[in-house]
Structures are given as C-alpha cells and as structure tokens.
C-alpha cells in the first residue's frame, strides 16, 4: 500500500513539473493585406516588403513570446504592433512589438530600421488600453481572447507608410 501511495505521489509530482506547452500562432505580412489608418483606409500597398510573426501564447504564465522578421520595405521601420481587428478591418493597437519612436511601454525593443528580426516577451505590463474596443491596460486575458479568436493582426509601420506598409492576420499554428 505504501508503495502505491508513493508511486502516485511521484507520478503527480512528475506531471506537475512538466513544462506547459505554449500555443503557437503566426502571421504572414504583406502589403496586399494592408488597409491603411483607422477611419482613413487607403487600400492595399504595392510593396516588395514581407514579414512573418511567430507567437507562443502561454496562458498559464500569462506571457506571449514573439519573433518578428521583415525585409524589403520601402523605407525605414518606425514601429510594429499587434492590433485588435478582423481581417480587412482596422483596429486599435493593444501590444507593441517594437518601436523607434520611443512611444512604446517600458522595455519595448527597437525595430531593426531596414529589416531584420526582433524578439521579445509580452506580459500584462505591455498591454495597452483601447477604450473604444473595451480593452483595459494590463488585461492579459484580453490578449488571450483576441489572439485565440482570430481577431488580431500584426502591422509594420514605415516612414513612407506611417499607417502601415505590411500587415498579416494572426492565426493558430505555425503556418501564418
């Protein structure tokens, strides 16, 4: 009997020690997905620019790890974000990925100006308020709901296209 209880206890501890698997999401960014500024749509952008965003959402630890890679844009990158909006609809910025304007939350990394890769981890401290879309600053649960409901998109803004040059809808999986 003692052996059975000990075996159950060891198995329980071993299971508790297993790392939580983060849920993968991704986006493929192009000018063809771009729509322009909120309430000032410009339509798609003809550009050679392209990018990819890889996300790993860990609901238990409330972290969103990301890697954003981009190249061949028409001008230097000013900032990149994740917005709350359906496919082909503009939405508010709720998370910064990088910025060269000094306007992101503390710890926001700089964007590689001409192209490259930037990585980071988003926590509740990096969640912005979007009052018009009922997002409260610091609400990581909102990030989870938005990402998992396919209503998030990544957008890279450049000097030439300040409203955004390339964009991609975030979807579940690694395919983008």
PLM regions and their residue ranges:
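Positively charged n-region of N-terminal signal peptides that target proteins for export
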Residues: 1-4
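Bacterial N-terminal signal peptides
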Residues: 7-15
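Metal-centered catalytic cores of metalloenzymes
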Residues: 20-80, 84-176
């Amino acid at each position: 009997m003692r052996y059975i209880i000990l075996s159950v206890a060891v198995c329980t501890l071993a299971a508790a020690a297993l790392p939580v698997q983060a849920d993968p999401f991704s986006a493929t960014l192009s000018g063809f997905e771009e729509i322009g500024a909120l309430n000032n749509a410009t339509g798609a952008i003809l550009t050679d620019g392209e990018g990819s965003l890889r996300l790993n959402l860990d609901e238990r630890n409330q972290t969103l790890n990301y890697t954003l890679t981009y190249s061949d844009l028409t001008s230097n990158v000013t900032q990149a974000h994740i917005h709350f909006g359906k496919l082909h609809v503009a939405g508010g910025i709720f998370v910064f990925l990088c910025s060269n304007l000094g306007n992101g939350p503390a710890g926001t990394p700089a964007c590689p100006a001409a192209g490259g890769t930037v990585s980071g981890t988003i926590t509740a401290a990096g969640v912005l308020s979007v009052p018009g879309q009922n997002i409260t600053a610091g609400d990581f649960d909102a990030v989870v709901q938005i990402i998992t409901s396919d209503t998030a998109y990544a957008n890279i803004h450049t000097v030439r296209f300040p409203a955004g040059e390339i964009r991609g809808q975030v979807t579940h999986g690694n395919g983008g």
